[in-house]
Design a protein with these regions (language model features):
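Extended, Lys/Arg-rich, non-catalytic nucleic-acid recognition/anchoring regions
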Residues: 1-702
Length: 702
């Protein structure tokens, strides 16, 4: 007989994400004791976190470090000239956030402390930085080098987004964003978006006098589409700034159950919602981004609408006009409110949650400005409407009251310099202004035209600093921490935006990036995973879905799955359940009464990359050698991203004109693929085994 210490027992575990519960029992499930205490309990701990949060902080830290690096390089270019005028200028700028007692120079003013020019004069002449930028553009006089630096510093610090490639005309072109939308809808949903006039749609979107609903209806009428098409209607609704259901946009009823089933680009919370959407939609979120580009174009067109000088639209000119409009709107509003002292004080003077002070972010306290927490525009407008309701009966100037109401209705009242709308400004708009400011300044500041031993002028270096982005496949430029650095150098020395191509071997760095950053196969140790859009990996995902399908109680056989792939997935980017049923009926494999089970309404997988390359290469994509070439090109597209010049170069270096033409390379360079799978080529296509029933030698993918 076993002693009590040797008897059999059960150990039960309840393992969760934040706790582990345990219990020890005998064979009859009675809790056992040890040292007089029941052997059960739990251990609590913090839930494990993925690397995503760390990566977000690291990316943000690097972004700020690179911004500081750009500013440092800019200061080095200006330092000699500025030191001739004010040797402590950069020190004063650095210490500007400090109180007077903490400053090393003990000066009251933060920028200018000359005998004949101080900060008071500066802010009187240039109420905002955009007033200074505009003056440098349009006024024919010599400016202090410090003023030039302040304007250039602002542009270099706030460059704009890099979503569009090419010239400023391409970045601000409606045709460009609308064409991208048409391509996206054709590829993702097989929707041919045709319209009577692109120019008319652009004019509708830009019209400030039209309501969002009117814009939506008029744009929809301009499209050559079925008026009952719910999907197109929801996309147009979104473009117009109204709220649309995600399920309608994707024609996917399963999306009705998500936490936030409706979205609107005009809401201040959209950017937060975008992160949540990506978790649900995955790569399909790219469709939302392309739709938003059309919406963003309308905002950009509105921002630049009043900024035209000599055929060019300048941001600074537009922003100065916004400042003037805000000033005039504020004057009218204060005039309306003056008849009611209490309401006036609550809205314009006191520190509140959604009054004017909260809207602009400061309140006048004891003769000085005090920064306070800002409210969003939606809350401010809501409060403004309420306050106007209180004074409606006491207003003496009815025309001004009606003007304010119209401005509120059009959402153009009291525009501010800093808002979320600034996020739609592409770097090309800022870059054009920077180049024109420098070109004008070169006439009276000769140091800007001085060239170094490589023939690069100071102005050219400033533009290079502004346009420079470290390619993600090059990684950190500081090789101090070798575990997170893989850059390959061509030569030693300090790396700057204007010598980057001479100091860094981008091709070798990209190859090293592939080897370092590519994940490894889930099942085979040391084998690199395939790109998410590799031909083989997409075919595997399609087969994975087909393997679950049943006609009645029977699964599809191998030959039928192959036929479905050849006749449906290799012809359509989006295969639906309806497409499958129609195909099986045409082949005489099912009748109207038989049920198809094992998948959702539509297939989630597709062979999109096969179809992309078939459009470019034709039927030769089915040749084995061409297919292997395509697989390699897909890998390069995934790695190099937007670096089109490198992509073209590596393709041409590897394959000659007989294998792929320059025109084909040009078309291929427009393709965009992102993401990686979890399985390797060796696992899917090279490991062989014998079928137990037939003895046939096969791979995992067949």
């Amino acid at each position: 007989m076993k002693s009590r210490r040797e008897q059999d027992y059960y150990l039960g575990l309840d393992i969760g994400t934040e706790s582990v519960g345990y219990a020890v029992t005998d064979e009859n499930y009675n809790i056992l004791k040890f040292n007089g205490k029941n052997m059960w309990g739990s251990r609590l701990f913090d839930e494990a976190q993925t690397a995503a949060e760390r990566r977000t902080f690291r990316s943000g830290r690097r972004r700020l470090q690179r911004r500081a690096w750009r500013i440092q390089l800019l200061q080095e270019l200006f330092s000699e000239e500025i030191s001739k005028v004010d040797q402590s200028f950069f020190v004063k700028m650095k210490e500007s956030p400090l109180i007077l007692t903490d400053k090393t120079n003990g000066q009251k003013y933060t920028l200018f402390n000359d005998d004949d020019y101080s900060d008071i004069d500066y802010y009187s002449e240039f109420p905002t930085i955009y007033h200074l930028r505009k003056a440098l553009l349009v006024e024919d006089r010599k400016f202090d080098v410090r003023l030039l630096y302040l304007a250039v510093h602002h542009i270099v610090k706030h460059r704009g987004h890099f979503l569009f490639q090419g010239s400023v005309n391409n970045a601000t072109s409606f045709h460009s964003v609308f064409d991208n939308l048409k391509i996206c809808l054709r590829d993702e949903f097989e929707i041919e978006l045709e319209c009577h006039s692109e120019e008319k749609i652009a004019e509708i979107l830009k019209d400030k006098k039209k309501s969002k609903r009117d814009k939506c209806n008029e744009i929809f009428n301009e499209l050559n589409t079925d008026k009952s098409n719910k999907q197109i209607k929801s996309i147009v609704t979104l473009i117009s700034g109204m709220k649309a259901k995600v399920a309608d946009i994707f024609a996917d009823e399963s999306l009705l159950e998500i936490d936030k089933p409706s979205i609107s680009f005009s809401e201040s919370s959209y950017e937060t919602l975008r992160v949540e959407l990506e978790d649900v939609l995955g790569e399909r979120c790219g469709v939302i981004d392309i739709i938003k580009c059309v919406y963003d174009w309308a905002i950009l067109a509105d921002i630049l609408a009043d900024g035209e000088i000599n055929g060019k639209s300048y941001l600074s000119v537009a922003k100065v006009n916004l400042y003037d409009k805000h000033k005039e709107d504020l004057r009218i509003l204060k005039q309306l409110f003056k008849g009611n002292h209490k309401v006036y004080k609550e809205f314009f003077v006191d520190e509140g949650k959604s009054n004017y002070c909260a809207y602009v972010g400061f309140v006048n306290s004891n003769g000085s400005k005090k920064n306070i927490k800002r409210c969003n525009r939606e809350d401010f407008i809501k409060n403004l409407k309420n306050q106007l309701g209180k004074i409606e009966k006491t207003v003496s100037n009815q025309s001004e009251y009606e003007f304010i109401e119209q401005e509120i209705q059009a959402d153009t009242i009291l525009p501010v310099q800093i808002s979320k709308d600034n996020g739609v400004i592409p770097y090309q708009v800022q870059g054009m202004e920077l180049k024109d400011i420098l070109a004008k300044a070169e006439k009276y500041m000769p140091f800007l035209s001085v060239k170094d031993s490589d023939g690069v002028s100071v102005s050219d270096k400033i533009v290079k600093i502004f346009e420079f982005r470290v390619p993600y496949y090059v990684g950190p430029l500081n090789g101090y921490n070798n575990t997170n650095s893989w850059m390959v150098r061509k030569s030693d020395g300090k790396i700057t935006p204007w010598n980057f191509d001479n100091k860094v071997d981008k091709d070798a760095s990209a190859e090293k990036f592939i080897r370092k950053m590519t994940n490894k196969c889930t099942y085979l140790v040391g084998e690199d995973v395939l790109p998410k859009h590799a031909l083989l990996y997409e075919e595997f995902n399609v087969l994975n879905e087909l393997n679950n399908i049943k006609i009645g109680a029977n699964k599809l056989d191998a030959d039928l799955k192959k036929d479905i792939i050849n006749n449906l997935f290799k012809k359509k980017k989006k295969v639906t359940g309806k497409n499958l049923r129609e195909y099986l009926k045409c082949e005489g494999l099912i009748n109207d009464d038989e049920e198809i089970t094992g998948f959702d309404i539509n297939f989630k997988s597709s062979m999109s990359s096969y179809l992309d390359f078939k459009k470019i290469l034709g039927d030769k994509i089915d040749n084995y050698s061409v297919k292997m070439m395509v697989e390699q090109i897909i890998l390069w597209i995934t790695v190099y991203g937007d670096e089109i010049s490198i992509l073209k170069r590596v393709i041409r270096k590897q394959y000659d004109d007989n294998q792929i033409s320059n025109e084909e390379i040009k078309k291929i360079s427009r393709l965009k693929y992102q993401g990686w799978g979890r399985l390797s080529r060796k696992f899917l296509g090279e490991i062989e085994g014998a079928d137990k029933e037939t003895g046939e030698i096969r791979t995992i993918i067949g």
